[in-house]
Curated annotation (Swiss-Prot):
This is Small ribosomal subunit protein uS11. It comes from Campylobacter hominis (strain ATCC BAA-381 / DSM 21671 / CCUG 45161 / LMG 19568 / NCTC 13146 / CH001A). Located on the platform of the 30S subunit, it bridges several disparate RNA helices of the 16S rRNA. Forms part of the Shine-Dalgarno cleft in the 70S ribosome. Gene3D superfamilies: Ribosomal protein S11. The gene is rpsK. Belongs to the universal ribosomal protein uS11 family.
């Protein structure tokens, strides 16, 4: 029997100059996604993906590492300007935003907080009793 040749598609890296960094900072983790202006994901990272486990995922240091990892992946696509959209009340929120400004070769164009606020919609979960 003849061997079958398996053809693989070549991954072509797009050259994208502008993008948007979405930072989702929850109480347990920090997720970072870099997209183009249309919203197509280019690179992503999170504290959990960088092998921070348990309570270490929610630290500001883990958030900083996640941002640096995602932006280094995005730099390979040619990102030079980014806008920042932050969501959530997590502890790594401010550190993540500051670390974007510290990365060389990346210019921040805008900053927006997109945390959803309820206008007396659904009833919140019951209070925790410890």
């Amino acid at each position: 029997m003849a061997e079958k040749k398996i053809l693989k598609k070549k991954v072509v890296k797009k050259s994208i100059a502008k993008g948007i960094v979405y930072i989702s900072a929850t109480f347990n983790n920090t997720m970072v996604t870099v997209t183009d202006e249309m919203g197509n994901a280019i690179a992503w990272s999170s504290a959990g993906a960088l092998n921070f486990k348990g309570s270490k995922k929610s630290t500001p240091y883990a958030a900083q590492q996640a941002v640096e990892d995602a932006l280094n992946k995005a730099k390979e696509h040619g990102i030079k300007e980014v806008g920042i959209k932050v969501q959530g009340p997590g502890s790594g929120r401010e550190t993540a935003v500051k670390s974007i400004g510290a990365i060389e070769g990346i210019k921040v164009t805008f900053f927006k907080d997109i945390t959803p606020l309820a206008h007396n919609g659904c009833r919140p979960p019951k209070r925790r009793r410890v």
